[in-house]
Amino acid sequence: NFNDRIYFGLTVGAYALDYSKYCFYDENYGGGEGYNLQTWSKINGAGFDVKLGAIVRPFEYSPLRIGFSVHTPVFYSLDYKTNARLESDVWNDLNVTNEVGTPSNEIGHYDEDTYDILNGDMVSKFQLRTPWTYNLSLGYTVGNNLALGAEYEYKDYSSIQFRDDAGYADSFDYENSTTDMLKGVSTIRLGAEYKVIPQFALRAGYNYQSSIFKDDAFKNLPLNSIQTDTDFVNSESLSNYTLGIGYRGSMFYADLAYKYTTYD
């Protein structure tokens, strides 16, 4: 704090990640035939980042505040485990005869499990670096009742990078090539809070985020992929509208908010 006009801040963040996903995909062709594919995935790891920021009051007797901040990428070290099981029920070849010498027309059940084939999970250890974040904000208060805020944030998602456990990117050429489909994202946040009485406030906000994907982006799965779940949507801009109320007492506080989201 310099003369109550310039404020500097620094934060070191530590993150723990524990993510699990199970997917079941099934096709039924009628007559008893069909197949299903099950996948199990798990990611564990930890990461860290550093945030630097400053708030400036350019005019001594004005409530105007200008904020700047820079967030380093989050540097993750992650362990990825996955396995899959494929089951199918199909009619046996009619040219195959059964034990009494007549053509077999029974449905046969077949299954393969990567855990059994590989004697364990498929395991990958890697490092992930997220984008840098740049932030500019403005704040202003009108009297003792109204507070206004505006914020702009930018992240370039095409700078995301995967590396192997030794820190080399060569073994992750496929994963890193997917970042060519990503682009910089701008986020704008606007907000207002009005205190009806000192303990009770009304709030409203708007949030706009441009698309993370390029217009011609698509999910490029390798031919040997075992992932079948739908987890990709090439959406364009995203808008959030919020309304809220808040109560602050000496022994109790409560907040309630409503959010409406639209995207293209």
Locate predicted features.
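Outer-membrane beta-barrel porins/channels
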Residues: 1-264
